[in-house]
UniProtKB/Swiss-Prot annotation:
It is found in: Membrane. Keywords: Membrane, Repeat, Transmembrane, Transmembrane helix, Transport. This is Aquaporin NIP1-4. GO terms for cellular component: membrane. Aquaporins contain two tandem repeats each containing three membrane-spanning domains and a pore-forming loop with the signature motif Asn-Pro-Ala (NPA). Aquaporins facilitate the transport of water and small neutral solutes across cell membranes. Its main location: membrane. Pfam families: MIP.
């Protein structure tokens, strides 16, 4: 019933995009045999827990890609605030371009989730094993925190502000906006990352363009987070937790709903009128 496909595109190039929950439960055992470079038949021990070498590679890819994304996006905001040289549309382009680059860079390795909400969406849709989701979310959040620390040290030291997401109006308004734009983002991701009838090689452009559009119209209202890691990282570094719940609840709910909605309307066979 489960199947694994190999392809260079973002859609099918990663285990996380094409592996069902049933096969996901077998992945660790398969990795043990497929990775003779890892010690003890494929398992390595991290914090007292055995993990397959392949999964550690996936986690490292997620960490690095999320770090570079946050460094570019948060860095653009920081430069704009300090120098006024980027402009608001430039910030939107920076986020979208960074996402696009990372999708093409590590999509075939880890799936380029870059976002705990996206990981949740894939899990809800049966496209990612639930038991691996917490490790992905932890790697993504750690990367966002690390990027925030580096930017803070680069632009003023430990007392420098970190670009946080804050509501531009009522908390309820920002919550709704975050839900809607993350729903929109996850809906697009599901289309290009899981549907064989979509143009997979354009996935980076589609996802990056969606991010850019969302930032352009939702940025002044909610900050256009769409990503709990993006909000949690700067909040931890800056010790500012105002309305943080908005940027956790909204994206998680939106991604889950977006993944479910696309699964509902997805064409699974030949279309008949």
């Amino acid at each position: 019933m489960a199947r694994r496909e190999v392809d260079d595109s973002y859609t099918n190039g990663s285990v996380v995009e094409v592996v069902s929950i049933e096969e996901g439960s077998k992945m660790d055992k398969e990795d043990d045999h497929q990775n003779p470079q890892a010690p003890d038949g494929g398992d390595v021990v991290v914090c007292g827990m055995p993990m397959s070498f392949t999964f550690l590679q996936m986690l490292l890819a997620e960490f690095l890609a999320t770090f570079f994304l946050m460094f570019a996006g948060l860095g653009a905001i920081t430069v704009e605030e300090k120098k006024g040289a980027v402009t608001f549309p430039g910030v939107a382009v920076a986020w979208g371009a960074a996402v696009m680059a990372m999708v093409y860079a590590v999509g075939h390795v880890s799936g380029a989730h870059l976002n705990p909400a996206v990981t949740l969406g894939f899990a809800v849709a049966g496209r990612f094993p639930w038991r691996r989701a917490p490790a992905y979310a932890l790697a993504q959040t750690a990367a966002a925190t690390a990027a925030s620390v580096v930017l803070r040290l680069m632009f003023g030291g430990r007392h420098a502000p970190v670009p946080a997401t804050l509501p531009g109006g009522a908390h309820a308004q920002s919550l709704v906006i975050e839900f809607v734009i993350t729903f929109y983002l996850m809906f697009v991701i599901m289309a290009v990352a899981t549907d064989d009838q979509a143009v997979g090689h354009m996935a980076g452009v589609a996802v990056g363009g969606t991010i850019m559009l969302n930032v352009l119209f939702a940025g002044p209202v909610s900050g256009a987070s769409m990503n709990p890691a993006r909000s949690i990282g700067p909040a931890l570094v800056g010790s500012k937790y105002t309305a943080l719940w908005v940027y956790i609840l909204g994206p998680f709910a939106g991604a889950a709903a977006g993944a479910w909605a696309y699964s509902l309307i997805r064409l699974t066979g030949d279309r008949t009128d």
